[in-house]
Amino acid sequence: AHELRTPLAILQTKLELFAEEHPAMDAETAGLVSSLREQLDRLTALVRTLLEMSNLQSISRTDQIALAPLVEEILTDLTPLAQKNNISLQQDCAELGMVGSDALIYRLVFNLVENGIKYNRLDGAVRVTLRREKQTAVLRVADTGPGIPADCRESIFQPFFRVDKSRSREMGGVGLGLALVREIAVLHGGSV
């Protein structure tokens, strides 16, 4: 994946230079440039996620993490996306802490909440709850979307799996978000 970063950066730079040097492009060329940008962004995101997944084991997991403020930060960060579709974000989080990687736990919760927003219905809601059950912190992210078919509930955590491949372009992403969620959870002694 590292070897892909440089050529991608060069392609992105050349595409930007082309667009700047040809401001009066005809509609067909402008459409092509836009399509190339979109695909380049998707490929860059894929490479970034693959690098993150390959480096998970080497990331320090010794941060003291206050989970309720972390959830609040994530909901604040995702508010603009939620507002686009009039999705309400709700939380009911106990004051719990854990030791782990703050950056990875942020990513885990972010990915779950972002999916709850993206795959929700218009005027829906996403609710995040955090409770202690025995000696375990239990995080739940629930939304008012159509849900995940029972036969896909295990597969969604496999890399590149999409429940509805026809919506991939519309939704963005490459099908690695929930695979990353599972890897992070397992790395921290948890499960999904």
Where are the regions a protein language model picked out?
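Short conserved segment of the HATPase_c
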Residues: 148-162
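Conserved glycine-rich
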Residues: 189-190
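Short helix-loop "hinge" at the ATP-lid/N-box region of the Bergerat-fold HATPase_c
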Residues: 116-117
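Acidic ATP/Mg2+-coordinating residue in the GHKL
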Residues: 143
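Short conserved segments within the C-terminal catalytic ATPase subdomain
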Residues: 81-90, 96
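Short alpha-helical segment of the dimerization/phosphotransfer core of two-component systems
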Residues: 35-43
